Structure formats: structure tokens, C-alpha cells
Amino acid sequence: MIHEPNAMQRLAHDDWETALTDLLDDLLQTQQEMLQILEQKRIAMVSRNLASIRELQPREEELCRQLTACQNRRNELLAMARTANLPDGNLEQLSRSVPLQQEAGVRERLSNASHRAMLLKHQSLTNWIIAQRNLLHISQLLENITTGGQTAPTYGKNTRVAGGFILDQEA
């Protein structure tokens, strides 16, 4: 369940465990959905299925907004910790400084969120590499079309180089 950005302001300052678990549950759910979308996007990019990529874009954008909302909630929670004179460097530090009834559950959620964040980084990098490879391929195709597949010699005088059939209709 994703909360409104100002929901943290309405929480009691002593209800740290609920605030942490709610935030982490929302974050984990959003991260899992984003991993699935990025996997589907990777498959679509490799197969050059533009229709699938377009279909995935709105959901990916919504998940990005949800991740941003989780980040904002995290920042609000850490700001509340700061005002309560609790450690505010990160959620793990905060969780170690407040009494938790389900400490193992909170620690497991923190660990899972950290692991999924790493997976999201790797999947995003993979997709970026695929996109760059596709752009390079398109660039090479355009170069071949415009030059007729022939490049100008590095050394040589008065050497005729084909301009390509798009540019001068000679090829």
C-alpha cells in the first residue's frame, strides 16, 4: 500500500516500527514490480519490439513516481528521527536505535530492500547497455546508407568516394 507523501507527518513520533515496516513493505512491493517491468523491457529491447516498450512505459513511469514517493517518505521519517534526537543517517541506523517488537522482520525487510536496490541498478545498467548497443547499430546503418558503405580514405589525393544513394543517387 503506497502512502501519500505527507502521511509521515501524521504519524506519532513513538510509532517507529509501524512507520518503518509500512515504508519498507511499500518499497519492497514497488521494487519487485519495477524489477519485473525492467525484465520485460529488456526482453522487448533485445527483440526490438517497440510496441511492447511503448506499452511498458506508463507503468514504468508510475513505478518511478512510487519509488520517489518512498524516497520522500524515507526522508520525512529520517527528519522526524532527527527532531527526536535519534540517528538519522539511514533507516538501518534508525532501526537499531528504536525498540522493535519484530526486530528480525524489520532487519529482513531492510536487507531485502537493499538487495533489490542493487538488482534494480544492475537491471537498469543492463537495459542502458542494450539501448546503447541498439543506438550504435542504428548509427552504423545510417552511416552505411548515407555513404554507400564506403568511407573516405585517410590518405590519398583526388580519390573519388561514393556519396551514397540517398545523398547523390550515384550508388
Language model segments and positions:
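Extended, charge-rich alpha-helical scaffolding segments
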Residues: 2-94
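Short terminal interaction segments
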Residues: 2-6, 92-171
